[in-house]
C-alpha cells in the first residue's frame, strides 16, 4: 500500500489550469494530461475543476489499494463503486450524502457517484483515443435511444448518434426542482437590506438567473429603460432575458447610491455587483462572497432552504 497523505496529492490552479499536484502527482500524469485536454477543448474552468476533484478522490483511493492507473480493470471500478456507497467521511446533512451519524456522513448520493464515474470514464476514453491498444476498462451498457440516422435532419439534425451508457451508473431518482413557496420567498427577500442584495435576489427569482450568471453581469449588460439583460450562461452562450421593472429600479438605485466607484487601489471594473465593504471593497463579488450573503440571510430569516439556486427554481416552478 502506498503511504500517502492528503498533502501528497491535491488539486490546485497554477494559473495554467486545474491539475493534480504534490509529491505523488508523478504517479498520475495521465490525469493532468486529460485535464489539459479538457481545457484545450474549452471546457469551462468549473467543469475542469469538478473533474479534477473527482479524479483526485479516485487516485487517492487507488493509492490506498496499491493500484496504478495502468492496472485498473472493470473489477477495480466495481470495488470503487462499492467504496463510494459505503465510505464514511466528515460532513453535514445535505443532498450529496445518504445519511449522517455522529458528525460523519455515510455513502455518496447517486448524483455524486455518477459524476465521479463520468470523470473516470472520460479519463480512460482519453487514454484509448491516444493509445488504441489500451482500451477503456469501463464496461459499456446499452445505447440511449435517440433519433435514427434517417431522422437526424431538419429540426433533429443537431442530435448526435446514440452513445452507449456506462454499466457503472447508479440509478438516480428524478426529483422536481425544490423552490421556495410564496411565504418563504417573501421572508427571505424581506431580510435583505442592501440594494445590491435585493437586486441579485430579484434577478434570480424574477429572471431565473444562475449565481454565476448574476456575478458575470457587467454594468453595460443591463438595459434598465428597456427592461432587458444580456446574460452569458453555460458554454459562454448569450441570451437576452427580461428584467422586471421593480428589479430594474433596484439595480438603478444600487448604481446611483451604493456601488463603489473603485477598489482600494483605485482599480475600476465593469462588473455590476461588487463587494460593498472591507479590504475587498470595489472588487467583483465572488461565488464565495455570494454564498456568504445567502448563508447570513438564511439564518436571519429562518428560511433554511434559501439557497441561491432555490430562487432560480422558484422562478422555474412559477413559470412552468
Predicted segments, located by residue:
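Active-site/catalytic core of tyrosine-dependent DNA strand-transfer enzymes
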Residues: 245-303
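Basic, Lys/Arg-rich DNA-contacting stretches centered on the C-terminal catalytic core
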Residues: 101-105, 169-171, 191, 225-247, ...
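N-terminal core-binding DNA-recognition domain of tyrosine recombinases/integrases
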Residues: 32-46, 56-155, 187
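Short, basic (Lys/Arg/His-rich) helix/loop patches that form interaction surfaces
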Residues: 241, 291-320
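Flexible interdomain linker/hinge and immediately adjacent N-terminus
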Residues: 78, 133-187, 232, 276-281
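Conserved tyrosine-mediated DNA breakage-rejoining catalytic core shared by Y-recombinases
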Residues: 207, 212, 216-250, 260, ...
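N-terminal DNA-binding module of tyrosine recombinases/phage integrases
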Residues: 1-41, 176
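Basic, Lys/Arg- and aromatic-enriched nucleic-acid-binding interface segment
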Residues: 172-211, 237
Amino acid at each position: 500500500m502506498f503511504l500517502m497523505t492528503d498533502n501528497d496529492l491535491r488539486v490546485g490552479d497554477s494559473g495554467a489550469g486545474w491539475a493534480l499536484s504534490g509529491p505523488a502527482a508523478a504517479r498520475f500524469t495521465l490525469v493532468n494530461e486529460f485535464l489539459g485536454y479538457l481545457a484545450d477543448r474549452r471546457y469551462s474552468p468549473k467543469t475542469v475543476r469538478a473533474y479534477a476533484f473527482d479524479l483526485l478522490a479516485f487516485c487517492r483511493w487507488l493509492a490506498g489499494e496499491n493500484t496504478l492507473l495502468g492496472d485498473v480493470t472493470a473489477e477495480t471500478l466495481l470495488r470503487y463503486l462499492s467504496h463510494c456507497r459505503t465510505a464514511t467521511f466528515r460532513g453535514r446533512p445535505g443532498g450529496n450524502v445518504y445519511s449522517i451519524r455522529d458528525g460523519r456522513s455515510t455513502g455518496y448520493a447517486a448524483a455524486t457517484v455518477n459524476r465521479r464515474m463520468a470523470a473516470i470514464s472520460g479519463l480512460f476514453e482519453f487514454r484509448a483515443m491516444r493509445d488504441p491498444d489500451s482500451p477503456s476498462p469501463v464496461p459499456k451498457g446499452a445505447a440511449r435511444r435517440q433519433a435514427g440516422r434517417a431522422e437526424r435532419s431538419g429540426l433533429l439534425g443537431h442530435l448526435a448518434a446514440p452513445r452507449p451508457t456506462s454499466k457503472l451508473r447508479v440509478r438516480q431518482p428524478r426529483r422536481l426542482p425544490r423552490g421556495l413557496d410564496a411565504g418563504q420567498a417573501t421572508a427571505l427577500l424581506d431580510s435583505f437590506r442592501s440594494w445590491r442584495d435585493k437586486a441579485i435576489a430579484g434577478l434570480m427569482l424574477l429572471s431565473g438567473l444562475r449565481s454565476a450568471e448574476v456575478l458575470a453581469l457587467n454594468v453595460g449588460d443591463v438595459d434598465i429603460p428597456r427592461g432587458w439583460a444580456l446574460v452569458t450562461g453555460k458554454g459562454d452562450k448569450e441570451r437576452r432575458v427580461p428584467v422586471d421593472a421593480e428589479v430594474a429600479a433596484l439595480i438603478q438605485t444600487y448604481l446611483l447610491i451604493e456601488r463603489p466607484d473603485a477598489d482600494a487601489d483605485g482599480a475600476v471594473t465593469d462588473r455590476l455587483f461588487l463587494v460593498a465593504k472591507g479590504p475587498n471593497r470595489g472588487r467583483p463579488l465572488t461565488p464565495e462572497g455570494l454564498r456568504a450573503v445567502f448563508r447570513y440571510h438564511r439564518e436571519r430569516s429562518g428560511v433554511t432552504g434559501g439557497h441561491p439556486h432555490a430562487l432560480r427554481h422558484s422562478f422555474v416552478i412559477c413559470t412552468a
